[in-house]
Amino acid sequence: MDQLKRMAAEAAAEYVKDGMKIGLGSGSTVFEFVRVLGEKAKEGLNIQAVAASRKTEALAKACGIHIIDFPTMEKLEVAFDGADEIAPGLMLLKGGGGSLLREKLVAAAAKRLVVLADESKLVEELGAFKLPVEIIPFGWETTAMRIEALGGVASLRQTGKSPFVSDNHNWILDCDFGNIRDPYSLHEKVKKLVGVVETGLFLDMACEAIVASKNGIHHITKGDEFNV
């Protein structure tokens, strides 16, 4: 699996040119991508990056990548991120690492979003992986009940015996809805709930997925079909 992540990372690095301003998401495949960019930076590649998580930022700095503040005016050339699940149409389920809100902000600030993954992340329908939902800690039990009224089973994410705390000082509910037949409708309903900050459904955001398999690298766009 680590070899596939390296393959996807190296393929994605070919998109990065000298002088670019890019977005960096989070997760193990993105971390490998950052390491590849760090190797290129040592060879003279000059780029600037906005990081979606503190872990990504720390790794990027350690690898010699110049981190900049979130852009206020101009768009980033491209953002790179991972995914927990990728369904046809490049519908994504993300947030296993707990950085979904910042990942979505960085993706929205870029001209295009490229997803890095191995073939295990390709699915026919989203939902085998529980849907992360970032929530306000105050009154979280009521928020969980509202989500469960929509048909899900919500579990508070823990770190040891304490709630997991996001970089935004919020909490995460991992919500089991089974197969998500209509991601657009579910995202809209959950996002409307009082106490919900953001969902891990990334819809109509990615323009391409770079997927590594034992047979090589596959470049998947929104209209492409793929075998799961």
Swiss-Prot record:
GO biological process: D-ribose metabolic process; pentose-phosphate shunt, non-oxidative branch
UniProt pathway annotation: Carbohydrate degradation; pentose phosphate pathway; D-ribose 5-phosphate from D-ribulose 5-phosphate (non-oxidative stage): step 1/1
UniProtKB keywords: Isomerase
Keyword Plastid attached: no
Binding locations of substrate: 26-29, 81-84, 94-97, 121
Pfam families per record: Rib_5-P_isom_A (PF06026)
Catalytic activity: aldehydo-D-ribose 5-phosphate = D-ribulose 5-phosphate
Enzyme Commission identifier(s): 5.3.1.6
Catalytic-site annotation from UniProt: 103 (proton acceptor)
InterPro entries assigned to the protein according to its UniProt record, in alphabetical order: NagB/RpiA_transferase-like, Ribose5P_isomerase_typA_subgr, Ribose5P_isomerase_type_A
Complexes and interactors: Homodimer.
Protein name: Ribose-5-phosphate isomerase A
